[in-house]
């Protein structure tokens, strides 16, 4: 069975994702720019009302993934505030200006999250060298990488995703994301070998259809 993670912005969307059968929730603000950190109040409400594993986006703004010291301070504060609220994990990522993983910043961010699973988000799709970047993410101890293979969609990036799955082995989970729908999900899985997929909740039916295809029910 392939795990389905639904990206949501509101309590209503989180509840809809749960009803639709999603296995995990990624809670964000501003999904139009790829997601930013949601408020502590929203995090608490979703965790309390949904009763599903909730991963929280830690990202101070849209745009690139190269962060100044004050932005990193804000991200650390957000992790400190989110952790006691019962979250299941965090979703984050930081790059250097040369397109490599910012290992120092990632270590800093992962320190207060110790014990929580960490997803390295789609900042991975703009790294200069995916093979090298994946090894850095593995060495950091992240639980999974969310990627479209550097393409506009997971289907378009299927070859690259499959290569990452092979490289990762059992060391880290590769989660495919990028316009995965009920209509193309089986093709994405067959071409990549991923065991987890990530999809934006467009409506309850969109996730329900995806779950039906991937859970076989």
Give each language-model segment a name.
Residues 35-62, 100-123, 156-182, 207-217:
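Alpha-helix-loop-beta-strand connector modules within alpha/beta enzyme cores
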Residues 10-12, 29-31, 60-62, 96, ...:
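Active-site-proximal loop/turn and secondary-structure-junction residues that shape catalytic pockets
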Residues 9-20, 66-81, 118, 125-140, ...:
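Catalytic cores of alpha/beta
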Residues 1-25, 30-33:
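N-terminal pre-domain/capping segments
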Residues 4-8, 25-27, 54-58, 90-92, ...:
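Hydrophobic faces of well-ordered beta-strands that scaffold small-molecule active sites
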Residues 25-36, 81-97, 140-157, 192-210:
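Glycine-rich phosphate-binding active-site loops on the catalytic face of alpha/beta enzymes
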């Amino acid at each position: 069975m392939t795990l389905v993670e639904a990206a949501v912005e509101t309590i209503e969307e989180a509840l809809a994702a749960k009803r639709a059968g999603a296995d995990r929730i990624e809670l964000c603000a501003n999904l139009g720019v790829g997601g930013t950190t949601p408020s502590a109040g929203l995090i608490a409400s979703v965790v309390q009302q949904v009763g599903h594993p909730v991963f929280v986006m830690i990202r101070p703004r849209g745009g690139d993934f190269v962060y100044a010291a004050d932005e990193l301070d804000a991200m650390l504060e957000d992790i400190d505030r989110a952790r006691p609220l019962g979250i299941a994990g965090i979703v984050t990522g930081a790059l250097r200006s040369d397109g490599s993983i910012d290992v120092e910043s990632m270590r800093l961010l992962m320190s207060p999250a110790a014990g929580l699973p960490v997803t390295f988000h789609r900042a991975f799709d703009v790294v200069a060298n995916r093979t090298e970047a994946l090894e850095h993410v593995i060495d950091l101890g992240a639980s999974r990488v969310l990627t479209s293979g550097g393409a506009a969609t997971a289907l378009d990036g299927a070859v690259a995703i499959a290569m990452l799955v092979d490289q990762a082995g059992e060391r880290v989970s590769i989660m495919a994301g990028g316009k995965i729908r009920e209509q193309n999900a089986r093709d994405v899985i067959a071409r990549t070998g991923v065991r987890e997929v990530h999809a934006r909740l467009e409506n309850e039916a969109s996730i329900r259809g995806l779950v039906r295809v991937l859970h076989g029910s």
